[in-house]
Amino acid sequence: MPYHRKHRRLRDIVRVVQASGARTYSRGSGFFAFFFAVAALHAQTGPHVLTVASAVDGRQQSYALYIPRSFDPPKEYGLLISLHSEDSNHRMNLSQVLGIVGRGAMTLEGTSFPPLRGRDLIVACPLARGTMGYQGIAEQDVYDVLADVERRYPVDRDRVYLTGISMGVGGALWLAETRPDLWAGVAAMCPDSMPGSEDLAPNLLNVPLRLYHGELDTIVPVASSRAWQRRLLDAGVPVAYTEYPATRHNVWDVAYSRDGALEWLAAQRRNRWPDRVRLVARSYQYSSAYWVRIDSLTPGVPAQIDARRASNGDVQAITVNLDGFTLTAQEPQPSQVTVDGTAIRLKRGAPLSFNKSPAGWRQGLVAAAGKRIGAEGPILRALSGRQIYVYGTLGAQTDEELAERRKVAQAASNWSTVRSHLQLSFAVKADREVTAADLDSSDVVLFGTAKSNSLVARFAARLPIELRPDAADYGLLFIAPIGKHYALVNSGLPWWTGADETSASGYLWEPAQIRELNPFGDYVLFRGTIAQVVAEGRFDANWKLPADAAARLTAAGTVRIH
């Protein structure tokens, strides 16, 4: 039972007992134990460390939690999700939000933490695997924590906020950009941006936002916040920016404790139905906000829609790089939608969906394509959730050969790093050990070809390409949907062959597996080392190779196209 329901039930029982005049300290009556339970519930205000089972690997993931001393269910409370910086953790981050510095910052003893002065906020600080950015797996960890807190406590869904420090606020901006309709505001401390976040700035149009940075910051130079301010203002997004002349990287010490950042944040409320929505999306995964959903885009290419609702309900929309979208009905109902200058009188009772034909825009659903949410790529999508690494057993002549195949899969599955103190690894299985339940719940990373891996052979008809058996000194890596999940197939040389981590793209703190693959679309063919790319790119909307890409791949004589 959620905490607030238990609390309310016990409190109501106490009031009934007190009103009856009954003596409530008798061991025999059971009230002795009962009042200990009541006391324990009241004692749960203040700081704590909780865990939640990860949706990615099932392991318990820690997060720090602060319950205000005024906590009194069933009253609903605002929730602040705070994301820690690089080389930090959930405990330290809660200390920073509460204004604790020095020796007490790493403890979670209730006496070491002051209350959030004048702020009745619940604060949750996810560990999110430590230092690996806030995209993919760590991103899911944050949403797991959000769901867990909402399950346990009475949260006002119109008062859920984001803040963070450095890497953490880079993650906060990413979360706010990709799901802007969830958040009521963002307080951003010296942002270190996540890859791909800059282009999504228009999505923050309806999310109250303030930036804070120290002019003397040498870890994340002040140019970062200045660039974000310009970027947001150029996109028409209201933003306030405070720059502190004599402050280094620890801008939060001033902004949280003395400059009212959290007071301002706690006063904001989510706007569920803004009159104007701007949405930029490069994937179906993040293709909706508020009352607008993009139905047809080219993954990897930014699609844009700027939709404005008039007082009579009619809508005007300007689009770029998209062929279909849907609006959610609201009062007053629109009678006309104008798209890129074309006025469309609406059909009564028909869905508010629109598609682009050769003749122009019209009302109606866009034709479904093979690429869709959960089946769109790129390569990194197969490494962003629950995953199993699978080596082949077909044709192995010796135990030593089988051991070498297993060793390759194990190397890929181990994401742990000394540099960022990340400890993360995934299940490794032989092809014959993979069950139907595995395929129903997980993406699979398959090593080998149809001749060496039975799962590659099993799914061959669904795979768009394959490496020829005689393609010595080549490596091929590609993603394809199989059922509800992805298969990531690595044939020939392992994808990290010859990788130079110092030149890898992506976010500095991401695991090597992520950074090495960040530049690639749905497939990459390389020769000798991953630095020697022969061809790479995206499959089309139906998971087929475009003609020019097919010509490049077949020219090498190493790839067979299905």
Tell me the role of every PLM-derived stretch.
Residues 316, 328-330, 334-562:
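Solvent-exposed alpha-helical segments and adjacent loops
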Residues 83-85, 190, 213, 317:
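The conserved beta1-alpha1 loop
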Residues 218, 222-313, 321:
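C-terminal catalytic histidine-bearing segment of alpha/beta-hydrolase fold enzymes
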Residues 41-79:
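A domain-start/cap signature at the N-terminus of enzymes
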Residues 69-75, 131-166, 177-182:
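Gly/Ser-rich "nucleophile elbow"/oxyanion-hole loop immediately N-terminal to the catalytic nucleophile
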Residues 158-205:
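Primarily recognizes the serine-hydrolase "nucleophile elbow" in alpha/beta-hydrolase
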Residues 79, 83-151:
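Active-site machinery of serine-nucleophile hydrolases
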Residues 210-213, 217:
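Short beta-strand/loop motif that positions the catalytic acidic residue
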